[in-house]
């Protein structure tokens, strides 16, 4: 069945305003009702693609928030990335944060590499989110890719680099176990 539900894709719709919407509104009344229904159905409410006001509306209502594919604004200013307060709020609510491999969300440099992915993971860990991290690659939504990470089979390259910084069991949590544990809500 459905495990995660995104309320919008970057712009406004009947539920919420997205990250690129200029009017700055949050969840609509209908959007709030949808989040309540997602709670009742034990489905993750995805904050990726929401603007900040919609994000905070979701955090207030949702029992199971997730940022399925978002990174750290502190490391790369992009409207789809999350600021420290948003990341901390997800961690506090025991939500998941799927680090995305979209190059423009990882670095302001011309080309992203595996070290950029690791940098975002390390930063989320520094905020207390080691048990909240997963991979939110978004390969189906991008044309440009991280050097040596263009398909899911290339996860090994990310895992090998992460193993230089973390125990293998922690890397396994990032890759798989954190998501599985969070699915048992």
Task: Tell me the role of every PLM-derived stretch.
Residues 72, 141, 181:
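Active-site micro-motifs of SAM-dependent methyltransferase domains
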Residues 128-150:
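Short acidic/histidine-rich active-site segments
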Residues 112, 119-123, 128-131, 169, ...:
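C-terminal functional module detector
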Residues 108-111, 142-151, 162-165:
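Outer-membrane beta-barrel pore domains
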Residues 98, 132-136, 171-175:
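Conserved active-site loop/cleft motifs that coordinate metal ions or position small ligands
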């Amino acid at each position: 069945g459905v495990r995660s539900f995104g309320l919008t894709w970057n712009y406004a719709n009947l539920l919420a305003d997205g990250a690129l919407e200029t009017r700055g509104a949050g969840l609509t009344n209908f959007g709030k009702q949808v989040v309540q229904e997602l709670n009742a159905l034990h489905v993750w409410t995805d904050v990726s693609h929401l603007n900040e006001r919609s994000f905070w509306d979701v955090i207030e209502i949702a029992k199971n928030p997730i940022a399925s594919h978002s990174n750290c604004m502190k490391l790369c200013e992009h409207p789809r990335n999350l600021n420290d307060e948003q990341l901390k709020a997800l961690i506090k609510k025991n939500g998941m944060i799927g680090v995305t491999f979209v190059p423009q969300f990882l670095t302001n440099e011309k080309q992203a590499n595996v070290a950029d992915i690791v940098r975002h993971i390390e930063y989320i860990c520094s905020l207390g989110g080691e048990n909240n991290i997963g991979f939110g690659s978004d390969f189906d939504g991008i044309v440009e890719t991280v050097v040596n990470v263009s398909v899911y089979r290339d996860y090994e390259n990310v895992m090998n680099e992460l193993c230089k910084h973390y125990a293998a069991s922690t890397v396994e949590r990032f890759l798989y176990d954190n998501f599985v544990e969070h699915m048992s809500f």
